[in-house]
Regions:
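Phosphate-handling active-site elements
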Residues: 77-88, 112-133
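N-terminal beta-alpha supersecondary unit
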Residues: 2-82
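DPxDG-like acidic metal-binding loop motif
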Residues: 97-125, 139
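ATP-dependent small-molecule kinase catalytic core of the GHMP/sugar-kinase superfamily
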Residues: 2-7, 13-28, 119-176
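Residues within alpha-helical segments
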Residues: 72-73, 110, 131, 139
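Short gly/ser-rich anion-binding loops that grip negatively charged ligand groups
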Residues: 54, 58-65, 96-103, 116
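Solvent-exposed beta-strand sheet faces enriched in polar/charged residues
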Residues: 15, 45, 55, 86-90, ...
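Short pre-catalytic strand/loop immediately N-terminal to key active-site residues, enriched for Gly-Thr
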Residues: 30, 85-98
């Protein structure tokens, strides 16, 4: 099968209201996720064995901790798929910038491999699987801007008038 290349879009929170702290360490919130154009680019080459690889490695992130590999493994485990994949990442989004790069990469991986491996999970099933990887993953699975509550996993799709955004990322990282 020929390689599949997809963009993993970034997002911005047009507003963010923290409404409480949960016992599991997450915060309850209300936010408006706006998906943007651009983002990281991922190329998927399927293999006939169950091995997963990611190139290039991201400095400071062990491969087994990378959300791309974790998403692929989660899909294998959920579906019993015995195929594998070699994944190339062209990183365009800065890490720790609050743009959802890791979550978007995980969602893009789930969507791509669900298709390439013929897993046939629904969008709702992929969103549920993605929520186990990160609170922002479901909005990227849904693929459209949304009002979010809970930990960001209770989504109401919304149409937002097209706007232009200038995103400036300072030379520091924020753990989100």
């Amino acid at each position: 099968m020929s390689p599949l290349t997809l963009s993993a879009p970034p997002k911005v929170n047009l507003f963010l209201h923290i409404t409480g702290q949960r016992d599991d360490g997450y915060h309850n919130l209300q936010t408006l996720f706006q998906l943007l154009d651009g983002g990281d680019q991922l190329t998927f080459n399927t293999t006939n064995n169950a091995e997963l690889s990611l190139w290039p490695q991201i400095e400071g992130v062990a491969e087994q901790d990378n959300l791309i590999i974790r998403a692929a493994r989660a899909l294998q485990q959920q579906t019993g798929c015995t195929q594998g994949c070699s994944i190339e990442l062209h990183k365009r989004l800065p890490m720790g910038a609050g743009l959802g790069g890791g979550s978007s990469n995980a969602a893009t991986t789930l969507l791509a491999l669900n298709n390439l491996w013929d897993c046939n999970l629904s969008i709702a099933e992929l969103a549920k699987l993605g929520a186990c990887l990160g609170a922002d993953v479901p909005v990227f699975i849904e693929g459209r801007s949304a009002f979010a509550e809970g930990i960001g996993d209770q989504l109401t799709p919304i149409d937002i008038a097209e706007s232009w955004y200038l995103v400036i990322t300072p030379p520091c990282k924020v753990s989100t």
